[in-house]
Amino acid sequence: MSNMVTIRVSDFTTLPGARYKKDGDGSAEEFFDKYIKQHLEDRESILIDFDNTWGYASSFLSELALEISRQCKRGKLNVREKIKIKSNDEPGLTERFWGYIDESANINS
């Protein structure tokens, strides 16, 4: 089994916001590029810790899910085996995130 790496969104920003870098600081695109992508390429499992921020825009969550889904598909990785979610501050966020993953799987088909 591969190693598990923990990535805290709060280490990136406490104000996650936009979908794309061009839309401003704290974007999902930047978070994916700086924190997630390398670990998927290295085939490490990832625990994304969504705690200790001021909340999440749907644009941030949906873009992050889409990028993760795309990368997993390219690498022939099972996203549900590679990605684990921690969200004690907002328990419903886990369900929302997996919903976006499921939607993005349909988009990427």
Regions found by a protein language model. Give the residues of each.
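Amphipathic alpha-helical interaction surfaces in cytosolic regulatory modules
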Residues: R8-E44, I48-W98
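The feature marks long, low-complexity, polar/acidic/proline-rich intrinsically disordered regions embedded
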Residues: R96-S109
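Small-residue-rich anion-binding loops in enzyme active sites
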Residues: M1-T6
